[in-house]
């Protein structure tokens, strides 16, 4: 029993790995073993009393079970490349279980993990996963329970009747009409006005032989620049070849800021802004029995296009200057990644090694109206600031991880990650006329910036128990990083056609050393009936050594600062099912951070500024309360309620600065937020399904600058609500209606000292449609959509109203029963 319980806990935490600073999150997700253990302490208890009862009728596999497996399970748990190494294509494979546990216990359906998953009594693990298929009905779960209780009888002939070829395609056509700001609508929805169409999805799968399967799937929506294709050839106990390509487009609004008192309160660039992104990947793998699993691959990622920015340019009207003129940024980004993954189980020890080599290139150009640019109304600015940036680097990293069940009650893991990055960058800023010629203004150059970073990370973790319904976890992680930078800089003010006013170049160099130690502990108790009680703590100590030096220029300086940071985070709570159909959970978290700065060496030339050497301490402390209730009031009514409170105070301490501050600690900021949420799912009448959910967040923030017109306290709320209804009109036709609404009202009237702060908007989306199942495996979907957005803080510059019509015909061969 201890071994089985420990296996359940180990599975609950496997693979939940956080990402750190690395650009390649995949390696770190598979490596960092220190922080995932807390999740096992807060997972909810499984309440078997919530399971639908088993069917009382005798079960026929071909009639009752095979259709359920085909519709909900076999896409992921078939013979080739089964998820979690769990197969449902034969009785022997199903009873063998997954990679770490038995899933089906013949004659004991209430204890079988398969039933817990499909019944969704474990909120941390549900099958089919959300978004991968519809949840099983109580009737289907009852049939599965009866099948298991009756001995898991299997009809091999029924399984062999599965088609060797499966094909599906869903051609679609869409019409969209927009009045108002079309660019804002595109930014919110990703839809372009007019007529568009393509294949919403397509797939082809063929079982070449008993061990080999080929699959092809994707989508193609040409006018949306939305494409995807995946190919896979898998042979059981041999290996696989996989390739995929994906491209998408994201749109941006070309409208800048708004200042109502101006004669022309807002501007638009008058061009379509979008960013194309995509990736291509190719993997080859070996999956030979009793040999290490090897995967060798290549991946290419890219972004290319133009996006709007929130750092707008100047508009001068009536002698008043406001930063509201829209700015844009062109981006050309490419990343090449080589990868090698090894996995192997050796004498009870799981060994994983992931290596990555990355080559990265980035080129950007920003266009923005220059400060003091003379224009008003709809006139083009007289001058622009052009900012060009280039960056490239290579990065190599390797992660080695080990895990082992040391005893019946102790599971351990350890790992090491090494990473090295070297790169260079450049920066140029020019002020030009509207025609592209030189203009008076800032000319700023940093032609060569060299960067180097090296990091080592070690981690170890252990999960012990259970003993007398108690489990304990502990993890420690240590990371050391050194970053160095060296570059030149030349800031010049004037006109490129005449000598510059400040032609003196400068040289900058810096070094940042960081050492971080993190400890995490947790305790979990399941001794109370239907209840889990947990407590956990996370502690972090970090030391940072900073060296910065500027040689030359008007404000040369040298700074050497040590910083000691400390974090403490404590959390405790419970999850209980006091009666059938009800679950209650609550938790409390307290978090404190403090950073002390010691300026060991600080030299400033006369006329220079003391910041940031004038900072001595930063600290924060916050509390969070979370409570949730889930209650099945009746067989046809399930409801959920939630509440969360977060409150954080910030303190800053400084040195004295004559004429400005006497120094010492000051309460620099405060933030409070209350969030209420609720949800209902109802089936009050035959053929009707209703759902509704809503949440409201009320926030308040203040800062040390209270009383100054340009930085005012603010308070406001965000509310969102969704509701829907589905009516089974006929056995083959469903009608659907849904509505989503959100609103924010935390805008501040702050015109006296600056631009408005915050936002006020109102957004509605209504969807109505029908789905009808035609003959020969075809399904038709028709849908109407209504969208409306208003933003009072932007006048009418961002508002729009839109209507959409969508039609999709889904075809499948062979026809599903």
Regions found by a protein language model. Name each.
Residues 169, 200-206, 229-233, 282-286, ...:
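Residues on the lipid-exposed face of transmembrane beta-strands in outer-membrane beta-barrel proteins
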Residues 173-179, 187, 218-224, 235-237, ...:
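Transmembrane beta-strands of outer-membrane beta-barrel pores
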Residues 69, 209-215, 237-241, 290-294, ...:
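Repeated loop/turn-to-beta-strand initiation elements of outer-membrane beta-barrel proteins
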Residues 180-186, 226-230, 244-246, 254-260, ...:
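Outer-membrane beta-barrel translocator domains and adjoining extracellular loop/strand segments
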Residues 176, 772, 801-817:
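Outer-membrane beta-barrel "beta-signal"
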Residues 157-208:
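Outer-membrane beta-barrel initiation region
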Residues 45-162:
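Aromatic- and Gly/Pro-enriched helix-to-coil junctions and flexible linker segments
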């Amino acid at each position: 029993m201890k071994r089985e319980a420990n296996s359940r806990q180990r599975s609950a935490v496997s693979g939940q790995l956080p990402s750190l600073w690395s650009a390649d999150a995949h390696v770190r997700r598979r490596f960092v073993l220190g922080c995932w253990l807390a999740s096992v302490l807060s997972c909810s208890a499984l309440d078997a009393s919530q399971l639908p009862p088993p069917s009382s009728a005798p079960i026929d596999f071909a009639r009752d079970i095979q259709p359920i497996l085909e519709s909900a399970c076999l896409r992921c748990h078939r013979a080739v490349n089964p998820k979690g190494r769990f197969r449902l294509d034969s009785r022997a494979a199903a009873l063998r279980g997954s990679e770490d546990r038995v899933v089906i216990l013949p004659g004991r359906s209430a204890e079988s993990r398969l039933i817990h998953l499909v019944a969704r009594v474990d909120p941390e693990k549900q099958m089919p996963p959300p978004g991968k298929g519809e949840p099983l009905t109580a009737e289907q779960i009852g049939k599965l329970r009866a099948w298991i209780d009756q001995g898991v009888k299997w009809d091999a002939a029924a399984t062999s009747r599965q088609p060797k070829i499966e094909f599906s395609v869903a051609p679609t056509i869409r019409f969209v009409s927009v009045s108002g700001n079309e660019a804002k609508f595109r930014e919110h929805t990703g839809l372009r006005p007019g007529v568009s169409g393509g294949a919403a999805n397509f797939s082809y799968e063929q079982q070449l032989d008993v061990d080999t399967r080929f699959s092809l799937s994707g989508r193609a929506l040409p006018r949306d620049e939305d494409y995807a294709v995946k190919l896979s050839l898998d042979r059981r106990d041999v290996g696989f070849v996989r390739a995929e390509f994906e491209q998408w487009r994201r749109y941006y609004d070309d409208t800048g800021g708004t200042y109502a008192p101006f004669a022309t309160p807002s501007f638009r660039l008058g061009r379509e802004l979008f960013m194309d992104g995509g990736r291509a990947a190719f993997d080859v793998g070996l999956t030979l029995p009793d040999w290490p699993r090897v995967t060798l691959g290549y991946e290419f990622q890219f972004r290319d296009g133009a996006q709007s920015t929130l750092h707008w340019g100047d508009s001068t009207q009536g002698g008043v200057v406001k930063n509201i003129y829209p700015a844009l940024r062109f981006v050309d980004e490419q990343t090449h990644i080589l990868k090698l993954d090894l996995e192997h189980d050796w004498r009870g020890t799981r060994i994983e090694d992931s290596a990555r080599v990355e080559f990265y290139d980035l080129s950007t150009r920003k266009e923005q109206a220059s400060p003091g640019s003379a224009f008003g109304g709809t006139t083009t600015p007289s001058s622009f600031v052009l900012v060009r940036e280039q960056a490239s680097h290579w990065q190599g990293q390797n992660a080695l991880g080990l895990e082992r069940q040391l005893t019946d009650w102790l599971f351990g893991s350890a790992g090491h990650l090494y990473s090295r990055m070297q790169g260079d960058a450049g920066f140029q800023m020019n002020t030009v006329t509207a025609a592209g010629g030189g203009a008076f203004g800032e000319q700023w150059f940093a032609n060569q910036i060299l960067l180097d970073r090296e990091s080592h990370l070690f981690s170890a973790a252990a999960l012990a128990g259970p003993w007398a319904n108690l489990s304990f976890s502990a993890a420690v992680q240590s990371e050391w990083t050194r970053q160095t930078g060296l570059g030149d800089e030349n800031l010049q003010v004037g006109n490129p056609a005449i000598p510059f006013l400040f032609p003196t170049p400068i040289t900058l160099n810096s070094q940042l050393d960081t050492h971080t130690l993190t400890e995490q502990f947790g305790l979990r108790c399941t001794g109370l009936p239907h209840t889990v009680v947990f407590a956990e703590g996370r502690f972090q100590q970090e030391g940072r050594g900073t060296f910065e030096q500027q040689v030359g220029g008007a404000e040369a300086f040298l700074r050497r600062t040590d910083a000691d940071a400390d974090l403490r985070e404590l959390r405790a709570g419970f999850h209980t099912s006091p009666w059938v159909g009800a679950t209650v959970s609550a938790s409390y978290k307290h978090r404190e951070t403090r950073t002390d700065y010691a300026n060991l060496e600080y030299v400033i030339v006369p006329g220079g500024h003391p910041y940031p050497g004038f900072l001595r301490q930063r600290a924060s402390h916050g509390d969070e309360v979370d409570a949730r209730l889930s209650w099945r009031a009746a067989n046809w009514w399930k409801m959920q309620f939630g509440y969360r409170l977060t409150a954080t105070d910030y303190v800053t301490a400084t040195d004295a600065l004559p004429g400005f501050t006497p120094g010492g600690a000051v309460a620099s900021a405060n933030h409070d937020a209350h969030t209420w949420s609720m949800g209902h799912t109802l089936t009050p009448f035959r053929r009707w399904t209703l759902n509704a959910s809503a949440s409201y967040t009320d926030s308040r923030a203040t800062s040390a600058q209270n009383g100054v017109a340009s930085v005012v306290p603010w308070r406001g709320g965000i509310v969102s609500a969704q509701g829907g209804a589905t009516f089974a009109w006929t056995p083959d036709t469903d009608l659907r209606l849904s509505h989503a609404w959100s609103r924010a009202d935390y805008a501040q009237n702050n015109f006296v000292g600056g631009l408005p702060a915050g936002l006020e908007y109102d957004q509605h989306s209504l969807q109505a449609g029908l789905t009808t199942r035609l003959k020969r495996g075809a399904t038709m979907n028709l849908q109407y959509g209504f969208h409306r957005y208003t933003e009072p803080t932007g006048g009418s510059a961002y508002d729009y109203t839109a209507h959409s019509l969508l039609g999709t015909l889904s075809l499948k061969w062979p026809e599903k029963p």
